[in-house]
Amino acid sequence: MAGHSKWANIKHKKAAADAKRGKVWTRLIKEIQVAARMGGGDIDSNPRLRLAVEKAYDANMPKDNVNRAIQRGVGGVDGASYEEIRYEGYGIGGAAVIVDTMTDNRTRTVAEVRHAFSKNGGNMGTDGSVSFMFDHVGQFLFAPGTPEDKLMEAALEAGAEDVVTNDDGSIEVLCPPNDFPKVKSALEAAGFKAELAEVTMKPQTEVEFTGEDAVKMQKLLDALENLDDVQEVYTNAAIAEE
């Protein structure tokens, strides 16, 4: 099945993440702490923690930092205690936006998120106002030129639900969130290393943005992404590359 062009957007996302590595590490440390607190410090029995640790190593985080975050999560080291809060809202033209945060001060966080929306042409919604427009999935993205038939066979054997070939030749593999670690391991064992592998909120349909509207929408997304308490920002806005 065909899909939208993804490759340029993914490369942009990876480059932006690399440029903000310090912020990426801060977000990953929070994720490790919360995952360890909720599911324990053993990565073999805690899939969420295992995924967070893998992301940390992919971002070149030192092992000592990872271990400290795990210990802080299970209570072995003093530190701030974070809670997860999701906010939903609308951007330019009613585009749907989900903002996942981890915070030790929800009053501060909601004020900052609301300000970012209102200052950049958007507005906060209520719980559930836009999340129904997204699917919670495991997503793998492979570069154009990846052998499609072999990847599809390996993905479906691993338990993937869908394999999507995009207009630019990149290939997406989608799976249930709980199966993400299993599918990731199986694909890697078959010789397929994804350029992007994550559990995400994937929009069911996308709204195309071009020109000035694209600039305004990107400004809103950047403002949200740059907030210290924000972990992830999801949107159904497809912003055209310049």
Swiss-Prot record:
**Which cellular components does GO assign to this protein?**
cytosol
The UniProt record lists the keyword Kinase: no
Record InterPro entries: Integrase-like_N, TACO1_YebC-like_2nd/3rd_dom, TACO1_YebC_N, Transcrip_reg_TACO1-like, Transcrip_reg_TACO1-like_dom3, YebC-like
**Organism superkingdom:** Bacteria
Tell me yes or no: is Transcription among this UniProt entry's keywords: yes
Its subcellular locations are: Cytoplasm
Gene Ontology molecular function: DNA binding
Q: Which GO terms describe its biological process?
A: regulation of DNA-templated transcription
Return the Pfam families for the record: TACO1_YebC_N, Transcrip_reg
Major site of localization recorded for this protein: cytoplasm
Query: What UniProt keywords are attached to this protein's entry?
Result: Cytoplasm, DNA-binding, Transcription, Transcription regulation
Q: Which PANTHER family match?
A: TRANSCRIPTIONAL REGULATORY PROTEIN YEBC-RELATED (PTHR12532:SF6), TRANSLATIONAL ACTIVATOR OF CYTOCHROME C OXIDASE 1 (PTHR12532)
Family to which the UniProt record says this protein belongs: Belongs to the TACO1 family.
Name of the protein? Probable transcriptional regulatory protein Bxeno_A1185
